């Protein structure tokens, strides 16, 4: 075994790429390290494509092994199971920039598996996973227009930081991942604290500039370790068939795309395509209908793009910078804690907000450590939203990714736990879809949070931008439709406030997207965002003054931290009885903070009263009503407060001489006592006769 190793400095860390030792039966295997975070990336491609396949079956599997962090998995089986949300998101992060680098017409199955085998808790594994994937594909011999670079960019004290550590990220106003080739940015994913557009654009340019060292290193690694290129050539177009398809369908498709209603347009496009295929079959029964379908799709794309480049109205009749008609409603569901219905053209989101206590927060145990997520946002895309049938069940990768994007857009304006001690779960149900449903979820979430009384800092709106570029001519489109996303060259989603950007996601399908184009897109997105915010603010301009009557109200009190064990009781008996008997939820913190949650105000008051009883100190000289709990020869023990007992000595029972305690007191008898003394050991001395004397004097 002769390993080939390439090392280089990248930001604060040393990156090492190694091949030739592990997983040698794969087409390519790279052990990639950034500091102590190490991933094994393998690539396998099938040499032959399945006959008739008209799509590229690329699979990216990213898996985090708990042994990488020196942990044993939880649960009964004690082994890793289905991918976590974090694993799904990182798999998508890797997939998105590499997919457009495979050539058109390449339909061989390719599988990339990234396994995290060692992790430094200060170095996230996503960037080195992207670098390792790029290196493995570069040396595999599989057709791939790489290499690809990747970088994380932070923004701390007005300065960009390359590949910040986890600790640095906690103090950063920006968490941006950018990936691209030597000449083009291909993918951006980010979360920001309402930063100006110029700062966001600068971070993309900075990250792309910095990753050139990665691209150069992988090119050198490929020169030394690369396998022979596959003997693959792109399929040659059947020019005669192309001309026939154009003649039969171009005019009909152009006419169909004059129809502005989505379902009607789709129906007419289907009619045109069916007629073209029927005519081709009549002329040549041996014609390959799959090839015809591909040519019709290409022609359809050319027709729509040509209209836009020529300055003609878009598919639905809008100008490039126009936003579709908006409808905004807040408080649409009677029993939810907050709700909103946001409609933009043929895209609609029904969004709900539910408030819970701290114990409702999501506990996440990953190889990077444990964390608690108080704000959750879940996105659902049922098949009826696009007029189709389909499977309904656990969320797919796309739904998880869109939900996380919307979460990033909102997270910057969420209140702290001190400002709002609730866990918050938002669910966005996409009830109609024709493009930009994730950004509709951002708008709907902002509205639902305000309706629920969550004190978010300000409203947030999102917009999806698109691009059509032919040569040097380009048109940036605001609020793209589903068709414009599919047929265009860029999907550019921006969420933010009036003051700045909170989330930016960009996927680019072509090279040649310049800084100028991105700048125009960001400025056009800002205008669209402000327009949407103006409409949203007319429906609900700020958060409600109070939370819903149906939501749990959290009341916070402070107790002596030394009294926490008294509230909990032996084996949790006291707090269990408190919650069951009052119907409240009670949470205790180490500093003595007690949070009582209930939608019933009287129940909360009763819980507070009982907690104050349990934690109150015994006062010398004070009169208490107590209960006899034990009788002994020398007196009786009386309970005066929860968990607080004292001794009434036989001499303190009565002014008369007492020979037998049982002649005067019995178990469970209620008596009035006066606290005479609390000694250094906390023992309480009580008197019945002194209490009677004091009461008599008061009368």
Swiss-Prot record:
UniProt EC number: 2.7.7.8
Chemical reaction(s) catalysed: RNA(n+1) + phosphate = RNA(n) + a ribonucleoside 5'-diphosphate
Protein name stated in the entry: Polyribonucleotide nucleotidyltransferase
Species the sequence originates in: Shewanella sp. (strain MR-7)
Role summary: Involved in mRNA degradation. Catalyzes the phosphorolysis of single-stranded polyribonucleotides processively in the 3'- to 5'-direction.
Subunit structure, as described in the record: Component of the RNA degradosome, which is a multiprotein complex involved in RNA processing and mRNA degradation.
PROSITE patterns the UniProt entry points to: KH_TYPE_1, S1
UniProt cross-references to InterPro entries, sorted A to Z: ExoRNase_PH_dom1 (IPR001247), ExoRNase_PH_dom2 (IPR015847), ExoRNase_PH_dom2_sf (IPR036345), KH_dom (IPR004087), KH_dom_type_1 (IPR004088), KH_dom_type_1_sf (IPR036612), NA-bd_OB-fold (IPR012340), PNPase (IPR012162)
Compartment list: Cytoplasm
Major location category of this protein: cytoplasm
GO-annotated cellular components: cytosol
Residues reported in the UniProt entry to bind Mg(2+): 485, 491
One record GO biological process: RNA processing
Cofactor(s), names only, from the UniProt record: Mg(2+)
Alphabetically ordered keywords of this record: Cytoplasm, Magnesium, Metal-binding, Nucleotidyltransferase, RNA-binding, Transferase
GO MF term list: 3'-5'-RNA exonuclease activity; magnesium ion binding; polyribonucleotide nucleotidyltransferase activity; RNA binding
KH domain residues: 552-611
UniProt-listed SMART domains: KH, S1
PANTHER family: POLYRIBONUCLEOTIDE NUCLEOTIDYLTRANSFERASE, POLYRIBONUCLEOTIDE NUCLEOTIDYLTRANSFERASE 1, MITOCHONDRIAL
EC top class, as a word: transferase
Stated family: Belongs to the polyribonucleotide nucleotidyltransferase family.
